[in-house]
A protein has these predicted regions:
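P-loop/Walker A NTP-binding region and its immediately flanking N-terminal helices
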Residues: 1-124
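Conserved catalytic/switch belt of AAA+ P-loop NTPases
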Residues: 111, 136-146
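Conserved binding/catalytic microenvironments
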Residues: 127
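Conserved D-loop-proximal element of ABC-family nucleotide-binding domains
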Residues: 131-133
Length: 146
């Protein structure tokens, strides 16, 4: 099972509830960094937050009481197949490092209209694998006013 298909959130439940509460009050930051050792559940946590945000106002929405994604939810199916139009996933799974061209995709992605008036989300897995040019490009994007 991959982080994008993990139905149950097994760790960071209190942190998740804090972010949900911020979202409910429209105070969720527009940039979040999850840092920690490999294998502790950061990606799973991120995908749960993404599924929560995308599944609001949809049938079979995120189950906050049990910290579970409903596998019948439309957004979950799109996210788990990496086909959600409001999600850009950048990862280094097929390469040694993340190249600057992948980071520049963020600019193209963010310039497009949002699908269903939902938030657009960029998830960079293994951000430590960016080369120096990619790091500089990301820094420039993050420094831009949003």
């Amino acid at each position: 099972m991959t982080p994008s298909t993990q139905i149950k959130l097994l760790s960071f439940k209190d942190n998740f509830k804090e972010l949900v509460n911020l979202s409910l009050r429209n105070k969720l930051p527009n940039k979040l960094i999850f840092s920690g050792n490999k294998g502790i559940g950061k990606s799973t946590f991120a995908f749960h937050l993404i599924n929560y945000l995308f599944s609001q106002d949809e049938e079979c929405s995120y189950n906050l009481e049990n910290n579970e994604i409903d596998p019948d939810n439309k957004s979950y199916k799109l996210v788990s197949n990496n086909t959600h139009p409001n999600l850009l996933l950048i990862d280094s799974t097929d390469k040694k490092f993340i190249e600057v061209s992948k980071i520049r995709e963020i600019l193209n992605f963010s310039s497009k209209t949002s699908f269903s008036n939902k938030k657009k989300i960029v998830l960079i897995n293994n951000v430590e694998k960016m080369n120096i040019n990619a790091s500089n490009a990301l820094l420039k994007i993050l420094e831009e006013p949003s």
